[in-house]
Amino acid sequence: MEKLMKRYALTRQGAKDFIICTIVTTIQNIMLMAPVAILYYITSDLISGSISKSNNVAYVIACVIMLVVMGVVFYFQYNTSFFSTYIESEHRRINLAEKLRELPLSFFEKKDLSDLTSTILGDCTVLEHNFSHVMPQFFGSIISTIIIAVSLFFFNCKLAVAALWVLPIALIIVGCSGKVQRGISRKKRKVVLAQEEGFQEYLETVKDLKSYNAEDTYVESLKEKMDNLEKESFRAELGTSVFVISASCILRLGIGTVALVGASLLVKGQIDIMTFFMFILVVSRIYEPMQGTLMNLAAIISQDVNVERMNEITNYPVQSGDGSLDVCLLYT
């Protein structure tokens, strides 16, 4: 719990809510496999010719129950995800403001106003978005994929390997890009701060600039900073997309390998048509949350810079004193 709090700048209650949200998201992802299971049994009855009116009623009831359960799970996941996230965001902003109030003046000498504003508003907003849309979905997808992957080995080991060999490779590609993406995020952050400082300085000194007829020159420097930010943003998006898209392309190879291996085993008589059909359905579904997981992993890696900036403030020693004020008057 302590590591989680320090790693993602969370309160203790926020860390507990995050764990609960991850568990609920895992259940949600597993529930999305329920339509695949019902479709499998319906297709099996159609192929075997054993479908009847009683079976039709049973399938209708199963579909209704599935929809109700999925609706409850989705509702609970939404509440645990967004309500807990915004409550934690409220506590984070208040605690950060209280911490700034207790810091010594030496800290503010090292920081620009735009830097502090960016930390309070920008970094908190990034963490707020990630913990409502990224983090629970990422860890929930990882856990649910592992559970589904283990269950596939009980049906056929060869097809399970053919379906899952791409997952660790795709995760390794994006995971190994962490150092590159953190470097890109830090460079972009410096450019963003330079632009914000430029606009802040312009607003504070606009009268002086006009009086010395230097406004046009300063505006040109601001335009140059904006161009630098545009270029750095392009590099940041390109650096992320290269790794994510490469991993996504490798992820799609799993469908082809399942089709090839499954067709070979089917011709040899080692599996039946329904086992092959089930793996095709599962593979087409299991890669969907993993596709989002790769994007989430890139966002999680890039948020490390935001967490570092917030931890720098929260871990800074506060100004201490006994509350008394000693005044010494000198008379000459």
Model-flagged regions — what are they?
Residues 1-32, 47-59, 77-81, 85, ...:
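Membrane-integrated ABC transporters
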